[in-house]
């Protein structure tokens, strides 16, 4: 096996369409997100990724469980992670609406993705507080018929193009005062600014400023639930599901780097040994992440927390890309663009769905409880 791209793994997951690479290149050139992605043959499948089964209108490329989603994310990461970050679909918001929304709210939200390609966003992270949701400063003040939202959000994926989404804001002090709302990101009361990036070219992350945005009472999610069930239930369901998938994206980037390196270089015996070690580490990380996803699907105790799965995958991916760059022969000319691209892109995953520092702290706090469960 000369190229990691030819591994049997490549044939197992959903095909992304023969046009995936072309679409990724157009997106990296900062083409209009909606216009470029609308041309992708696989976009309709991603547009329904995460929809509850009763809202899915096509059986084509349905991803029904977390393990299948993990495999799909790795495949997308191999082509370009920017495709996933820029894709249409309910994305992270799907978990919140499915968990907290009443029937009318779910029909209104998920129905948008049945009609046409639709982009969504998940507005939680703030400039001063980061993803420390318990310290949210964005406020939702009750008024006649609804709420007025003021504050700001940062690093909001698809924030420039989203037509719908979920917004987290504080209606009262304390942990129980945090609530989730359906909102329209295109409302004129929201000022949006696209953020400059050094990696993931084509991805649109936005800073969003809310100036007394009116949200009707009917858009408050979880009104039929106890306050103790609202925020924690929606946030943890989202993060636990998607953190391993972020790790899979990183592994996809690393696998592409391995493929590109071997395309350019005929390895010496020493380099072949290095490649063999890197591939073994890749397969180990990929298998461990897939195992946790399968355990989640089967409602079994997990061998690792979702946060640590993501952390382990990202660390391995970073190390693979870095070692490949250092091992690239100097006499082969400039480093290939694809390797520099992988180097920039893989750094982004550290800051996606929580840094490794946060996940390690979380693991240390929860480890005794996890150990007792397995005894």
Predicted regions and their residues:
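C-terminal helix-coil-helix/basic helical segment that borders enzyme active sites and/or dimer interfaces
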Residues: 25-36, 262-270, 282-336
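Glycine-rich phosphate/cofactor-binding loops in nucleotide/flavin-utilizing enzymes
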Residues: 2-4, 9, 328-375
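N-terminal glycine-rich flavin-associated loop
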Residues: 81-104
């Amino acid at each position: 096996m000369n190229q990691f791209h030819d591994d049997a793994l490549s044939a197992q997951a959903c095909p992304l369409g023969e046009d995936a690479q072309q679409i990724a290149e157009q997106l990296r050139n900062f083409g209009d997100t909606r216009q470029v992605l609308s041309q992708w043959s696989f976009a309709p499948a991603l547009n329904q990724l995460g929809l509850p089964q009763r809202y899915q209108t096509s059986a084509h490329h349905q991803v029904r469980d977390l393990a299948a989603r993990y495999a799909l994310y790795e495949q997308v990461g191999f082509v370009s992670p920017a495709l996933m970050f820029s894709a249409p679909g309910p994305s992270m918001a799907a978990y919140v609406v499915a968990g907290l929304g009443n029937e009318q709210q779910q029909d209104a939200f998920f129905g948008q993705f049945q009609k046409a390609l639709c982009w969504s966003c998940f507005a939680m992270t703030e400039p001063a507080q980061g993803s420390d949701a318990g310290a949210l400063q964005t406020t939702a003040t009750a008024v006649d018929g609804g709420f007025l939202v003021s504050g700001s959000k940062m690093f909001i994926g698809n924030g420039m193009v989203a037509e719908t989404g979920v917004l987290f804001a504080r209606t009262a002090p304390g942990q129980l005062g945090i609530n989730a709302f359906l909102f329209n990101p295109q409302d004129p009361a929201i000022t949006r600014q696209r953020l400059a990036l050094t990696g993931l070219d084509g991805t649109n992350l936005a800073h969003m400023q809310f100036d007394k945005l009116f949200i009707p009472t009917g858009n408050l999610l979880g009104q039929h639930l106890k306050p103790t069930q609202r925020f924690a239930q929606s946030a943890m369901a989202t993060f636990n599901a998607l953190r391993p998938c972020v790790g899979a994206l990183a592994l996809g980037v690393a696998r592409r780097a391995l493929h590109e390196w071997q395309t350019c270089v005929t390895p010496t015996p020493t380099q072949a040994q290095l490649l063999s070690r890197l591939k073994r580490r890749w397969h180990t990380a990929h298998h461990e992440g897939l195992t946790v996803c399968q355990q989640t699907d089967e409602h079994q105790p997990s061998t690792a927390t979702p946060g640590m799965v993501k952390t382990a995958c990202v660390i391995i991916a970073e190390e693979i890309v870095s070692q490949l760059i250092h091992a690239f022969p100097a006499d082969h000319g400039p480093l290939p663009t694809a390797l520099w691209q992988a180097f920039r892109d893989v750094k982004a995953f550290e800051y996606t769905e929580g840094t490794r520092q946060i996940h390690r702290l979380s693991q240390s706090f929860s480890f005794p409880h996890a150990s007792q469960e397995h005894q």
